[in-house]
Amino acid sequence: GIPQYPVREKGESDRTGTKVHFWPDHSIFTATVYKKETLEGRLRELAYLNKGIRITLTDLREVDESSVPYSKSFFSQGGIIEFVEMLDQNAGRNALIPRVIYVEGKDDHTNVAVEVALSYNDSYNEHIYSYVNNINTIEGGTHVSGFRRSLTRVFKHYGEREHLFEKAKVEIEGDDFR
């Protein structure tokens, strides 16, 4: 929407956080009715992607018998680790390794931070969820291609170093690890 006024300081407070109210502007948005379930899914996802923050959805369109509006909060202390666990659990996939593999790092020179959480499960198919700046990159991208290549390279190097592939009669490929 259009800002009503510039950001202004209101004074000191012992409260923290940001409160956002959203009312779609009919002159900007063609669709101004949103499904609560869609919003809940996105806010739940954001809570996993930003561990430690609480996001609350209040839907003033829906009130209970006491005129209290519908409200639901989303919070994740474990972040993307919990996200991977939830995705596997909701899909009925069983983890082959008891703990989610988690790696994070930041390049101080480029100021690029990366978080990776992965789980090997009993599903035949690969399920990759990738995000850049909290936006789901559904179609992948160079970051996903680079991750797949690196994962393959690391596993192949480890397997060769540990002589795990000596009896294999075929070339081990990336799909064998994914």
Label the model's feature ranges.
Residues 1-77, 83:
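GHKL-type ATPase core
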Residues 15-16, 49-51, 110-112, 176-178:
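Short, well-ordered loop/turn elements at secondary-structure boundaries
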